[in-house]
Amino acid sequence: MIASTESPRTNFSLSRGLLDVGIAVLAFVLVCAALNALLPFPEIDVVSAELRFFKEHRDEFDTVFIGSSRIHHQISPAIFDRVMGEAGHPTRTFNFGINGMFPPESGYVLERLLSTKPRLKWVFIELDELETRRIPKAEASRRSLYWHDWKRTSLVLRKILDGDDQRDARDLFFFHTALFAKNFANIGRKIDLSWWISHLGKKTAAPKSLGRDGDGYVPQIKTMSEAEAVAYEAGLKRAVVQAELRRVSPSTERAYRQWADDVRKAGATPIFLITPTRAQTKFEFRPESGVAGAVMPFNDAKGYPQLYRNEIRVDADHLNETGAEEFTRLIADTLSRLINDGRIQ
């Protein structure tokens, strides 16, 4: 029999080395987790300021719209409240739309908003697929980083892995994983602590992003040029022909189910809103999905032709001020009708 040449001391050293590495990794993870819990919310352009404003004024609102620029520039709280009041269902509305805020970032912000314990009645959430694409202009920004906690990142990674394009999937998988790692490791958080200390006890001014009435709505005045209108009409005709009813992806469904549950736990009713974009695909949830929320789809050029007139649009996806006012009235009328019919409460 040939005796082993590997000494017990070597085996012990290797095991001890692995143990030391494991302890170091565990310590790093625990420290990062502790810092995540203790550090103030990151100072993110527009987002942080509006969250602070909402927290300070949360008792003044019972209705919130949350989503992207298609909410920010297209929902007038003043008009919504007026129409709802005239219908016998008074509301006090805040527009929490932020340019470029798509799910799952919007879901993360919704959770932060609900954590302020507002007394809400209605929460409108823009309905769209989870955004997984890389946005070159924003890749290096803290805006891309701050919402990448494990809850959001796992949803994005699952959506990527469920996709068809494996080449893009590999790149996107590592991209979002890297953002999660940076966020978890608190990269760049020193600036947040410094900001928090320097503003401790100071009252901050209302952010300009809240618009002229301080309710979050910023209308757009622009109209399409003749050339833009021609291109828009041609694209809309194609979109109407290709219109379809499509179920959201499993990851998107999971995300919206959680958000709907969170809203209901907060004592409010969730409503999912599809804005009048040129894309005519109607999203829906599986009947057995368990998503507890009504869907209001307004991306229907045949059903709502008044929202697709050239003169009330900025581009294929956005309405100007005139269009936004008309859209807001339609939403309020629809909600009032659902309440009166007992189909929502």
Where are these regions (language model features)?
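Short hydrophobic beta-strand that contains or immediately precedes a catalytic carboxylate
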Residues: V64-G67, L319
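Secreted/periplasmic serine-hydrolase-like ester/acetyl group-modifying domain
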Residues: I2, A140-Q258
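Alpha-helical transmembrane signal-anchor/signal-peptide segments
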Residues: L38-D59
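Active-site segments of SGNH/GDSL-like serine hydrolases
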Residues: K190, R257-F283
